[in-house]
Amino acid sequence: SGEQTIYENIAVQNTQVNAGDLILVNDANAYVDNNASEIVSIYDKKTEHYHVSGTETSLRETAVDALNRMLEDFYVAKNHSDIIVISGYRTKDQQQKLYDEDLAQTGESTSTRVALPGHSEHESGYSLDVSLYEDGVQSDYDGTGDYSWIDENCDHYGYILRYAADKAEITGIQAEPWHYRYVGEPHATYMKENNLCLEEYLTQLKDYTSDNRLQIVNWDGEIYEVYYVAADMAADSTYVLVPPDQDYTISGNNSDGFIITVDTGRIQSFEENSTAETTASEGQTVPEETQAETAAAPEENSEEAVG
């Protein structure tokens, strides 16, 4: 039956609550991380089958890499190369400018169309807006027709349609078919399959612990385990249980805790259910050969996960 997966405690700085692929940025949760070291120009890294509005339009490097794969596959599937990224990463000052311009246009005291400065997902570098651009003419992107391929498949690349019409009451943002958010795999697939927006998903994850992990079968059959650890706000850092012999990442939720995502190295067999909860007794046994395949130096993992 193999050996038990051993968990060990590592200390994670509480400032990391505000960083990672799964952070929630909305009216209630300001973006405070302000680490722009991973922000890169999309233009410098993009593939040939989409456009970008300017050389300064930027995203986090992981989000650009995923975007490149997605839009290359979209081109292969549908033979369209007219998507243009019109907005990515914004500084707080740029967001303030957009906000002020909207108020000037509407004459209102608050905006329903532009997020408050400090509260826009764009400031995190994980979000982008797209339009269509052909023969010098830009037109609105609505995600219909051939372009529905993107909503149907974006989870394969770690992206979600962030502001769906049926979630407006929860997100506080009206439908934006052009706004995509990178959350990473396997989270995008789980959210899509269970029709959850990011707010709902992060709330649900609080039900899972290192003893009672959420098992997610990714779109490609790879099995992940996900759980939540509340931040110890009385201290500067929080002890988080992680499996040192497996690949894992740690993301803050931007409010009060950490989400640990473990790549078990296992692939779903056909008779297994698509999603299941894993308890400590059933889930902590991993075949020895699987452990060997996914083993990595704990020090490397620990640094990578929280850096």
Task: Describe the residue ranges of each PLM region.
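Extracytoplasmic cell-surface/polysaccharide-interacting catalytic and binding patches
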Residues: S1-G88, K92-G307
